[in-house]
């Protein structure tokens, strides 16, 4: 995943309604009509949000007659997560002797150092 893709996903997830849509889809595939029942938005507004989520491949859709069903693209979320997991705290890159006794405050297993 490149920086442009990550930026696009962050922008897509920067909207409260789209985050709520993702949280509903965590439980499995949903019809657009089911999503509409949970929100106070119009069908065109839902379509707009779903297009943004689909364009960055966070959700996938399928048609069944006149109905559209959406589900999370788990592989895309895994790639997104791995991008952030690959970011290493600069303190972890230093040797223990170079840290002057400071532990990283952002990583598991390290104590939180307050300045």
Model-derived segments and their meaning:
Residues 1-2, 24-30, 55, 74-115:
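C-terminal regulatory/oligomerization modules of transcriptional regulators
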Residues 4-42, 68-76:
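N-terminal helix-turn-helix DNA-binding core of bacterial DNA-binding proteins
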Residues 7-10, 50, 81:
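A generic alpha-helix structural signal
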Residues 23, 47-49, 66:
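Base-recognition residues in the alpha-helical recognition helix of bacterial helix-turn-helix
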Residues 37, 48, 54-55:
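Alpha-helical residues within the helix-turn-helix
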Residues 45-49, 88-89:
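Short alpha-helical linear motifs
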Residues 46, 53, 70:
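Divalent metal-coordination and catalytic microenvironments
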Residues 55-64, 71:
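Beta-hairpin "wing" of winged helix-turn-helix
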